[in-house]
Amino acid sequence: MAVFTPSYPLTFPTVSGVRTQRFSLVRTVAVSSSPFTGQDQVVQHEGEYWTTQISFPPMLKDKAAQIIAFLLQLRGRRGTFSIGDQDRKTIQGVATGTIRVNGASQTGNQVALDGFANSTNNVFKAGDYIQINSFLYMVTEDVTSNSSGEANVKIEPALRQGIETIADDATVVYSNTKTIMRLDSNETAWDTDQVSKYGISLSATEAL
């Protein structure tokens, strides 16, 4: 018996667009409050990851079949797919051309980049997404390049230390940015009504 395994991550289907999307960043923060003083002890752990919940618009069976086939190929939580914030596929900033990582083995909530136009304001703006390797980050402050086309870019979440290797000159994606996710459930289900309109939704978490 031949066993076919899809090549993951799968490409997210575009046959219908999405009706609604919730996109969120989850952090692992422990808070312990003293019962005597009321003071908090706060510890932020390394775990940070994107999640999404998507609802597709009502559709007839020809389009629904393509969405369902995509979901079934994921085989529950086994497979992965690429997706980003569907309402933020382009940046607000003025960056053009090829932007690259400026220096290897970077860590933390700031990444040095180069390849910008020299001495330019707002090459990225707060709220823009960038993608390094297969991981997604949001720029948290407007960015101005220096006279050499370099800039230090503040981001959330922090660079994925221990998961991702940041190589010097790695290309930075800033259009149609994505990360890799897997479904939150092993069940694949859909609804239909009396006129064969399909209702399909999914929930997924970044695959780290």
Enumerate the predicted regions with their spans:
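Extracellular/virion structural assembly segments
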Residues: 1-208
